[in-house]
Amino acid sequence: MASAWKVKDPTVAERTVVVSGLPVGLLKDQLVKCYFQDEGGHVEEVIYPSKSKGVAYIIFKEKKVAQDFIRQKKHPPGSEPRLTVSHFSEKVFNYVMAILDLSVFRTQIELESLVVDLKKKIPTLNFSPLGPSGKISVQGSFLAIMKLKQALISKAISPLENNRKDAGERRNWNGENPRRILQKRENSASILGTFVAEPAGSPETLVLDTDIFLYLKHKCEFYHLTLSKYHVLCQERVDGDVTTICLQDAQDGSCSGSVRHVKEFIEECAQEFHLELRKELLVLEGMGDREKRNIRQALEELGGRYPRVLTNVHSTHIDLIGPPSDTYLFKTQLMKSAGQKVT
């Protein structure tokens, strides 16, 4: 996987193009790789297959050729025009690896059958062989891991709730703007006159990618307005890349259903942000004091110019999180401020 880490080099990243939606299969993998390597001698390396299914990383010898390739949006012969061609940019959350202990399900179902069922429900996940103790490692996107979590929770509680017809109620995600989602929920609530009755004071817990949660908290005013409007208290626990949120009714159950209402709203916003946001990384290591001072000054000046970009300053690097175009331009301006060449 040495070539995969090569993309992390800033000088390589700017010459790298990401092509997603490619066909998966041994013969198809070979055809795709041969096709992209035959780009008039301009390709330095093709990383395919990669950790992400159907995603290829094309490293060109020159940045300009990579930019031209993106503009032309070339596709392999015979493929459907559903491929996504974009400049390499580290996603807010690329992939997650989790170790599961499925032994608790032995009394309900054969564990091998459970794994087969999970693979069918969430095909984007990669599963390791099932261990004799019932443990298995799983790797995939953050959203896929969260779907897996919900599937396992439903499997665990289903024997206790067979008589509850609404236990498995699902939400329809349609990619609406968060403010429109909230307005839609408010309209539904006003028509019904009240929320569906729930046990008073029942807290709700959800898990979010830390970068997405910080963006929601610091860049989205409606997040705080929603908590206040529905009288919901929020307790946060940040643990590296994952943040756990506990929501609880601040009025001791006087507004039944408000906690779940807020939880579903936050989950839908987080899903939208996961698809829309990108993270750019500016490495500070190796910079002199003058360069770092210029970076800090530029951060203050550019903050007002790019209000949709969240900046997290660390001792070794700066995270820029926001819409792809804004984060890229923000990073470009910071590099210029540090005296680094931007081509």
UniProtKB/Swiss-Prot annotation:
Keyword RNA-binding found: yes
Statement: the UniProt record of this protein carries the keyword RNA-binding: yes
GO molecular function, one term: RNA binding
RRM domain span: 15-90
Cited SUPFAM superfamilies: RNA-binding domain, RBD
InterPro entries on file: Nucleotide-bd_a/b_plait_sf (IPR012677), RBD_domain_sf (IPR035979), RRM_dom (IPR000504)
Membrane-spanning ranges: none
Source species of the chain: Mus musculus (Mouse)
UniProt cross-references to PROSITE patterns, sorted A to Z: RRM
Keyword annotations: RNA-binding
Protein name: RNA-binding protein 43
Coiled-coil segments: none
